[in-house]
Amino acid sequence: MTLNEIFNAKLTENGDLSFKKASDNPLLNILFLTEYYQKHLDEVPLLEDSDINRLFAMFIRDPRYGMGRRDLGRRLMSMTDVAIDDTIKAGRVDDVFYREYPDTYSFACVLDYLHSEIVKGNELVKKWMPRYSSKNLLLARTIAKYWGMNKQQYGHFIKCNTTENKLSDHRFDDIQFEHVPSLAMIKYAHAFSTKPETKERYLKYLEDVKAGKKDLKVSTTTVYDIYKNRDKIDADLFFSKIEKISGSWIPIVDTSGSMCDSNDSFGKALAIGHYLAKCSTYCPNKVVSFSSHPQLITLGQPVQRRGYWYYQQASKEALKKSQYQREIDSMYTGDCSNTDFGAVMRLLSHLDGNMPEYLVVLSDMEFDSGSNTSKEETMRLFKENGYNTKIIWWNLNSRNITVPEMDHYGNIYISGYNPMLLKYLAAGFDGEAFLNNLLREYAKAIGE
């Protein structure tokens, strides 16, 4: 180990060698640890006020072109002093109240800006303004007082024409489904499909979407959104409409017991692993699972390990489900006793010359003792044989800071649940190059 590695070494919950950080670059560390810092905001590293750090903060917050981490993004944008208009561009209007305090000049400037936007008819500003009926009652009173309005005047001024308001006002005929934002469409799909006033129109709309006659907005829909709501929506339709990226990779999903946590790490791993398997050019529809015994899973293929009776019952139940649900169910192995990543690496070391470009490891990184040694041996074997295969460490751990290796082999570090970011990978990239390209592409996307 290097001197830096020695002083940053630690053990996983299961006794394997790991580290406290991935790199000396704080942005790369945050990129890998967003799940943890989202739950531990008081531990977020301080970032100095610079253009690159401001752009990174916006990227972390942005649900359309970035990672969509609201609380962490707010903290970073406040820390790096992102401008008001850029704060709103990356997130929501109420993000500005996270950093501004009443009775200050900057707070007054924010309210003047928001007032002018509402006068212009900005519906999104209206939607995210604090309301008397919410937990932000005191803030709403402060704003109304500054604008010289009483409760009724303020409520009328910020009343918006969103899907939520149309539903609450029973203006069902005003809802144009092709204009409903992506997350609202998922949130209210059950209501649309069951309310007598909308059911017939909604089902006709879905048929039109399938026929290519109408659009379904999915700009901020993630694979995890589809996974969470797979029993409430037409998961096959939503999955078919999200952007697909292709890559030479093998998704490797951790199915150990520690993944079944309050952060739903297992659910996120399944959602991302399923997406990557569908998009893999190396082994389409294949996923490697690992716990005590690695398994190669074919999406949608029933698991027969529990005997004839279970197989027959599972097959009958599968007929009632969508293709998406069947493929997700096929990833449940029942093996959750260990986190033996070393067993996976030992098996993969026997691959012939036809190698994938990436091994995408979806895990909380709490590997069993000895896994690091097996990984080191396999990476050394890859290098000796001239293989350029790299590991994408996809961290889902919200409990601990656990890094499987420091930036030694040029591997990639990422977290969250947006696999679309992998489209910015390129041959020869290491973690730093990937991060830099993410920020370059994000700047283009938002017009910076």
Model-predicted regions and their roles:
Residues 1-268, 278-448:
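Long lumenal/extracellular ectodomains of secretory and single-pass membrane proteins
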